Amino acid sequence: MSRTTPLKRVRNIGIAAHIDAGKTTTSERILFFTGMSHKIGEVHDGAATMDWMEQEKERGITITSAATTCFWKNHQINLIDTPGHVDFTIEVERSMRVLDGAVAVFCSVGGVQPQSETVWRQANKYGVPRIVFVNKMDRIGANFFNVEEQIKNRLKGNPVPLQIPIGAEDNFKGVIDLITMKALVWEDESKPTDYVEKEIPAELKEKAEEYRVKMIEAVSETSDELMEKYLGGEELTQDEIKAGIKAGCLSLSMVPMLCGTAFKNKGVQPLLDAVVAYLPAPDEVANIKGEYEDGTEVSVKSTDDGEFAALAFKIMTDPFVGQLTFVRVYRGSLESGSYAYNSTKDKKERIGRLLKMHSNKREEIKTLYAGEIGAVVGLKDTLTGDTLASEKDKVILERMDFPDPVISVAVEPKTKADQEKMSIALNKLAQEDPSFRVSTDEESGQTIISGMGELHLEIIVDRMLREFKVEAEVGQPQVAYRETIRKTVEQEYKYAKQSGGRGQYGHVFLRLEPLEPGSGYEFVNDIKGGVIPKEYIPAVDKGVQEALQNGVLAGYPVEDVKVTVYDGSYHEVDSSEMAFKLAASMGFKEGARKAGAVILEPMMKVEVETPEEYMGDVIGDLNKRRGQVNSMDERGGNKIITAFCPLAEMFGYSTDLRSQTQGRATYSMEFDHYDEVPKNVSEEIIKKRNG
């Protein structure tokens, strides 16, 4: 069967937004207007089709990006729902990798909020063209033009309104289309699909003219031809304006802005028209970079012909079909029942069934074509971020980077009988989510789970109960401390054992140097004249790496250290890899004790939005938690406080903040960097660890 939608008419888009901007409602309406779901799901009553996991329904927040296919004006739109909560930034990163364009939804009252900044940064990182939809225009305090200012000032974007609102709050009637210069009005609330084109209301004519001129100016800057025409005083045609907007959108030099209220069904159809008109088809975005095993780079172009190449970007467990692996096909096509080659793992995989997801319904398909997104059933070894390719062309597409977790808790099943069920559940969840890790504490034998924040781990424990029926007891949250050194030292260490028969001999001189934060570990071999034979150098490196696992102060992993082996000696008979590994390991530990070792802790970027009267209390409390306040702003009549706070002091913050501000303040928090722990705190940590 050949493809039904040509590549040119495919759009892979994500809806990205802050937690309450109305992203799920917007996705819902898109599905409704494109005819996929008949009754509109409301987040308010917890029945949205996009939010298909139980907890999302309860918390009213979107956690997993379900990929949904729908159709609008002969175009296939693959909608990837992205979560809007900071603990799930990894999900957002992951979906940004496979999207070609995004719709950024902002609340007309809240405007640009902390999570929007994070999502915007990630979209910039992956070069994702976007259009803005200012939602909730019917709410009290709605202000489209404020949001435009904030996108300019806070996000440093170049917003270009293609519409301006007619009225706001209760009087929001529709929008003025600045391209056709017509008013689009939704008159009958009971028939959300119908809107009428009218003349622009007299009182808005001047504003519409002013914004049309701004739009035309922005469009004329996208090409020399349009600029000449514009400067020569000629009118640009509607087609030229649209082509200019698309060019500006794709080059990221402008962000087209639209508005509406998804909840009241106003403004969604023009948004869909804009997705089709201005966001890129898979063959209009930059080629994706790939490499072969030997490191040669290659550029993979999105085409139907050519060897198959796809990226697995999400794994989910579905109660009916088992494990689903969501893939984005970049080149060629994939048939159900065929084989594909996992070039990241170097393994052959059999492709079972292929599914296309329509929010929570699934359709079985025979083939997945270039540019499309679907789910594969039956893959054994493929994890998030792996490449599936053809055996003839084993390309590895760009790998995704996943952050290290910053918080851990110990979990134990309520009953001993559940121990095995719990391990199975945790391993399945870890397969789905690369920012979540499971390990065993060697001393206590407890199972430790680690993730990106308190909410992240709460949801994992919750999913164990719901999906795998395992009840777990959760310990106190533990912070992922690290250690590093502050001084350069040189250390000699000789490991020599003589105990009948063959001895052990390894002798090294190591130089330990501190590195910039975030550099990790660097090993340098500076041995001259073979004083340590080449074959023992990897053992020295390995010995140092083993010592890095447990720092000298409190046994935390050591990072940001450069270790150079620059001298040493060996024994013809007694030297061995083992001896050099031990010499390096012990030498590093001795050196680290003299190198001014310090403990580092994760610092979180905290943003609190509070009514002015509680500002003093909030700041006082952040200072008590060893926080450093960086800035204070105003937004929508509230004060915004940004601070860096140690994660160790932030447990249970939401409850404290609620009681300080009578529940009127909100906050968001994400990991930012590691910083040195003050001496008094460091002493306490060491005392606790070394008991």
Curated annotation (Swiss-Prot):
Residues that coordinate or bind GTP: 17-24, 81-85, 135-138
Cell compartment(s), UniProt: Cytoplasm
Domain (tr-type G) ranges: 8-283
Key word GTP-binding present: yes
Keyword Thylakoid among UniProt keywords: no
GO molecular function, one term: GTP binding
Chief place of localization: cytoplasm
Pfam family, one: GTP_EFTU
GO cellular component, one term: cytoplasm
GO BP term (any one): ribosome disassembly
UniProt xrefs under InterPro entries: EF-G-like_DII (IPR053905), EFG_II (IPR041095), EFG_III (IPR009022), EFG_III/V (IPR035647), EFG_IV (IPR047872), EFG_V (IPR035649), EFG_V-like (IPR000640), G_TR_CS (IPR031157)
Cross-referenced SMART domains: EFG_C (SM00838), EFG_IV (SM00889)
Protein function: Catalyzes the GTP-dependent ribosomal translocation step during translation elongation. During this step, the ribosome changes from the pre-translocational (PRE) to the post-translocational (POST) state as the newly formed A-site-bound peptidyl-tRNA and P-site-bound deacylated tRNA move to the P and E sites, respectively. Catalyzes the coordinated movement of the two tRNA molecules, the mRNA and conformational changes in the ribosome.
Protein family (similarity comment): Belongs to the TRAFAC class translation factor GTPase superfamily. Classic translation factor GTPase family. EF-G/EF-2 subfamily.
Matching HAMAP family: EF_G_EF_2_B (MF_00054_B)
Protein name, per record: Elongation factor G
Origin organism lineage: Bacteria, Pseudomonadati, Campylobacterota, Epsilonproteobacteria, Campylobacterales
